[in-house]
Amino acid sequence: MPRLSKLIEKLEDRLSGKWGRWYARHKAKLPVYIPLGLGAWYLYGMFVNSLRLGKQSVFNTTGEVIESIWVFNPFKNLIAPFTPFGLGVTAVIALLICLITKKGYSWLSGYKFVRDKRGFDILPDGTHGTSGFMDKKERARILETGPVDQLAGTVLGKYKDDPEDDDKYAEYVTLKKGSGLTEHTMVYGATGAGKSRGFVKPFILQCAKRARLGLQGAKDSLGQVCQPESLILVDPKGEFYESMSGFLRDEGFEVRLFNLLDMENSDAWNCLADATEDPNLVQSIAEVIINNTSNSEERQDFWSKAELNLLVALIHYVIRLKGPDGKLLPIHERSLGAIYRLLSSESFQSLEEIMNSLPKDHPAKAPYGIFKLANRQIWGNIAIGLGNRLAVFQNPLVDKITAYNEIDMTLPGRKPCAYFCAISDQDSSLEFLSSLFFSQLFSRLMNYARREGDGGRLPVTVNVCLEEFCNIGKLIDFKKTLSVCRSRGIHCQLIVQSISQLSDRYEKKEWEELIGNCDIQICLGCNDQMTAEYISDKCGSVTIRVNNNQFPLMPLFSPVYGTTRP
């Protein structure tokens, strides 16, 4: 049972908070409110005294002469409302108000409706829907509110009892641990809506706080030991790395930058290095490249499929290249750039001789054999098409940052890391590289969790914040990844400009599955009709009171004749 001092302290905090908010809202008008309040008090006391003296003059049994029922003495008028007669008058007036007004009727009858600030009454019947904002009990069950330094979850917004309250009385809102909701988040925000400032930067700070608590072995609100966390972030302008990387290093994060915007300042990542360790990745690497360099009509045509088989064969060949000593070549000689150089420098006859010289059990033989089922006369055309898809490797910087391997894809699941992927918001020719980066990230982390994790979960929780989600290229089968990665200890935050943009990138209702996997959806603002209608429909319907007034319209000066047909 709580101690009396605690209850008193809690009551004082509540009263001081309410009084403080009221004072902040009305501070400028207090010089007007105070005289008006005193005047109203004085006039009401005069009214009570007039009723009392009027009653005495009508039912006078003492013979006392009452000259006037009006009293102007301010002391008598200010005291009158608190006399037994004054309290009785006040009670009668309050009862009449309850009987006359709708609010009073709801108090007496128990039929409680809510008066909306937009000017209509929300009824409890639920005939046409029961949607509405959370009340305090519902918020306490799902959300945590309070000062941001006392919260560790992802900041979802601010809450104020009254929109007119000062910001210092606002409480930050985060998802409560153990609420039953997934931490996958979908954020909608048009250009300039504040996605970076309002969501991403607070998300980074809260992630760093949780990682620090995890390293310290602190306990969360459920009494469980906090788990260390990592952060993988899309950085469309390079601003997050510039402003937050030093802070994250000081917090103990291993920081890496895969920079497709300013490649001379990038850490290197070779996707074929991961394929060397896990050959099952070869097919997915080839599919990501083909799908992200094709339009929707080309992805299933003959040429794309033929180029896919040729690319799979070349990847299998390159990742197994050996030197004269019989050992695998250094990783920087086994890259996508090496495949492009093989296509551009070797004649197709030389490529044919290389493939024919491979052992029969070599993994490159099967996809190359399927490629050769095409008419021999178009083999060169297929090779030219694949070379065009890989043309970005003509750039020495692109070749360099994809040759060496300085970014470990499984490290974020083993220790706190902060990986930034800087992408261009103008040039789409490198989208397949950012898509490859995140496709392999999810694949490698989930495989590591399945094989090495405790109960199939990563030792370190990984947060993947996909800012400008639609501009990183299409992630193959991401709807399946999103539906299962939570159980592996991976949480995703998808940030898009609009639903129309999302549906353009992920077609055939796939975008609906992505949204359906996100229990938390935040709308920072939208300009398109599709997003506005979706959010409105998602909010649901509510039952309101509708008043219909009907009366006949009759002319003032002309008689109305009623006629009937025989």
Region spans (language model):
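Accessory regions of macromolecular translocation/handling assemblies
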Residues: 1-229, 241-253, 320, 550-566
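P-loop NTPase motor domains
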Residues: 3, 168-169, 176-490, 505-506, ...
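Short beta->alpha connector loops at strand-helix junctions that form conserved
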Residues: 259, 496, 525-526
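Conserved H-loop
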Residues: 497-501
